[in-house]
Amino acid sequence: MLKSNKHPRRIFLGHATRLVIAGAITPLTSPALAALPQARSLELDHTHTGERLSVVFAVGDRYVDDGLRTLNHFLRDHYSGEVGSIDPQLFDLLFETRRELGCTQPFEVISGYRCAATNTRLRNTGGGGVARQSLHMEGRAIDIRIDGVPLADVRDAAMSLQAGGVGFYPRSKFVHLDTGKVRYW
């Protein structure tokens, strides 16, 4: 039997260093992230795909890459399947809107990212309200509602944040949020 001439403290420090490095490389699981005090998460239901999602997208002032990728896929163009890159500030806006409302219900997503072809098709179908240079095509806009919360309350909460555009569409039953200039319609 070989005897190690390393001091027990050095052995311990070596193991501890390997664990710290492994922890930095291996991301925490979603439940572990959600338990962190500064975790920011979203709960979403997609009205067109039927998908549901609960995801941590940021902890403190850092975005969580896996959370952002998951959200990008969830908010893909549901007509074409194309996945866009969503502005992380849009997730902050959603998080703060829900916090302002003091509710825990998920957002119902009507529209997230749109490719140019989908945007053109929607403009040409006569539904109205689809901008030629829509921020949906840049991943900077989302159309949402919250079950059981009046649309006007969702609009007012988002407007109070002064963080981007807020469109109110009561006939179509959604509120548009974007990370463009502060404006309301």
Enumerate the language-model features and the residues they cover:
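N-terminal secretory signal peptides and thylakoid transit peptides that target proteins
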Residues: 1-23
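Short, solvent-exposed loop/turn and secondary-structure capping segments
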Residues: 55-56, 121-123, 156
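Acidic helix-start/capping segments at beta-turn-to-alpha-helix junctions
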Residues: 106-120
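Extracytoplasmic/secreted envelope proteins and their assembly/folding machinery
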Residues: 91-95, 119, 151, 155
